[in-house]
A protein has these predicted regions:
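N-terminal phosphate-binding or glycine-rich loops at protein starts, especially the Walker A/P-loop
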Residues: 1-52
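Short glycine-rich or small-residue beta-strand-to-loop segments that form or flank ligand, phosphate
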Residues: 4-14, 73-79, 104-110, 181-186, ...
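Short, ordered loop/turn segments at secondary-structure junctions
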Residues: 10-12, 40-46, 79-80, 111-112, ...
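Short glycine/serine/threonine-rich phosphate/pyrophosphate-binding segments
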Residues: 14-24, 47-48, 91-92, 112-120, ...
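Accessory alpha-helical/coil subdomains and C-terminal extensions
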Residues: 40, 97, 105-110, 116-131, ...
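Glycine-rich oxoanion-binding loops at beta->alpha junctions
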Residues: 50-104, 113, 141, 163-166
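C-terminal non-catalytic interaction/assembly regions of soluble proteins
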Residues: 255-406
């Protein structure tokens, strides 16, 4: 019997999730204990439909090296959620397919829902006496997985966000003879890690973004307007960063308040997301120049701002996952253990995936100012090491040269 390795990607992509794939695949191909490395096309959902590929040719033709610096999910993704009931027929169907393909090692690269899949598969394996070793490799730009210092994908997304906010601030400062407000809406529905990283854009104390709002603290539109008025007495060009999920603390997202704002000359509601709502609110209450910007998916797919630290850790976590499985670990997620901020020292370990899935890690309240409008120095010490170093992405005809499935 062969001892084959099966790997897949799931959930939203990141700029370095393929770095983790590179780590798993390269380590698997190099290890004599593993006979074949098989990729699942579109995760567990694709595997159920028998969509797989042999990963060995990618090393032979040089594609594997390009995969390392390609954003998105090379193998494709899915949002397939396995049933809670472990007696559901999908489980024996999956394990029958594992047997047919002689799978001894299963790796799933993803976030919270992916770790839920790892948990269910490993628990089912235990009930039927399967010796398949099942390991989760973390990824998420949201940085909200528990029991790990941070997650691959966050450092590059944070670097992109902070870089873009710094560029927006430079653009806004051009017309410094009239008051203006620029509102930057950043991903993060329940956790504000990405928005908090915008604080890294500041060149000095008091620099833009002057105001930063996270979903961890209840948001008051009235207090926001007063804070904007106060800050405009000190700077004419105000940049404000908000998480898309800012809310009133009682379950109502700010974007849901849009019906309270007026309509345009055609009777259309002036709304989309939280940023647009606040843009209209500032326009209505203060009557000054204001615009809102959504960073949106660029935060997770930009190769131009890859953090070398992030990419290196993504690949290393993939390699460590293979080693952990070969050492007999199963039902675990690779976690990141920080030993020091300065110098930055990181170690890898494993944590019980059942203690991770379906939980969220918020930005600590003590890292946010009491009025909820700024970020403290503790966060800066935490985040700054994660954005260090640049990555030279292969270029062709003046544009990034990415890998893609043929």
């Amino acid at each position: 019997m062969n001892h084959n390795l099966l790997v897949g990607q799931s959930g939203g992509p990141t700029a370095v999730i393929n770095g983790s794939l590179y780590g798993v695949v390269s380590e698997g191909l190099a290890n004599p204990e593993i006979d074949n490395v098989i990729g699942m096309i579109n995760g567990i959902e694709g595997f159920l439909a028998n969509h797989t590929m042999d990963m060995a040719p990618l090393k032979e033709n040089g594609e594997l090296e390009r995969i390392r610096t390609t954003p998105g999910s090379y193998l494709g993704s899915c949002r397939y959620k396995l049933p809670e009931d472990l007696s559901d027929p999908v489980y024996p169907e999956l394990f029958q397919k594992f047997t047919e393909k002689e799978i001894s090692y299963f790796f799933y690269i993803g976030g919270n829902d992916s770790m839920d899949t790892v948990s269910k598969l490993s628990r089912y394996a235990a009930t039927v006496g399967s010796d398949i070793r099942i390991i989760g490799v973390p990824k998420t730009i949201d940085n909200d997985l528990v029991l790990t210092d941070h997650t691959p994908g966050y450092g590059s997304a944070a670097k992109y966000g902070a870089s873009t906010v710094r560029e927006i601030a430079i653009d806004a400062s051009v017309y410094d003879n009239k008051p203006s407000v620029t509102i930057v809406e950043i991903m993060g529905r329940h956790a504000g890690w990405l928005t908090a990283a915008s604080v890294l854009a500041r060149k000095f104390k008091g620099d833009n973004p002057v105001l930063i709002y996270l979903p961890e603290v209840a948001f008051s539109p009235d207090a926001f307007i007063e804070k904007v008025k106060e800050k405009l007495t000190k700077t004419s060009n105000l940049v404000v960063c908000i998480s898309e999920g800012i809310n009133d603390g009682n379950g109502t997202f700010v974007c849901e308040l849009a019906s309270d704002v007026g309509t345009d000359t055609f009777g259309h509601k002036m709304l989309t997301g939280s940023g647009k709502y606040l843009e209209n609110l500032v326009k209505e209450k203060l009557g000054i120049k204001v615009r809102s910007v959504e960073l949106n998916v660029c935060q997770r797919c930009s190769s131009s701002c890859l953090s070398a630290t992030d990419l290196d850790e993504a690949a290393a976590s993939g390699r460590f996952a293979v080693s952990a499985a070969l050492d007999g670990e199963t039902g675990k997620m690779i976690n990141f253990i920080r030993k020091s901020d300065d110098p930055y020292i990181l170690e890898f370990g494993t944590a019980d995936v059942n203690e991770i899935c379906n939980k969220e890690k918020a930005v600590p309240e003590e890292w946010i100012t009491k009025d909820g409008s700024d970020i403290g120095d503790e966060f800066i010490a935490y985040a700054r090491p994660l954005i260090q170093g640049s990555v030279e992405v292969p270029m062709k005809d003046g544009l990034p040269y990415f890998a893609f499935r043929k």
